[in-house]
Amino acid sequence: MKYRPLPFYLTIKKSKIHGLGLYSLAKIPKDTTIGMTHIEVGNDLIRTPLGGFINHSEEPNCERKLHNNRWFLKTIQDIDRNRELTLRYSMYKP
């Protein structure tokens, strides 16, 4: 399997929120796991390319889920083509 820093249905482009952001190239259904954003190593977090470009929103369309010391990005609603993926920033464990 070839490594891809981003899924084929995402791209990075200028964001209206801040700097660059993650945008959908196709419709993404609710409850889709997009990929890994961070890895916990001891008390440290290592950010992946996916985690480096998602912007904060008070009304996000994605959330983070922790599984085996890895944080994954998951959609919490359907995301239409050309829409920016957003996350409410919080690295605290639930």
Model-based region annotation:
Residues 1-94:
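Conserved catalytic SET/PR domain of SAM-dependent protein methyltransferases, capturing the structural core
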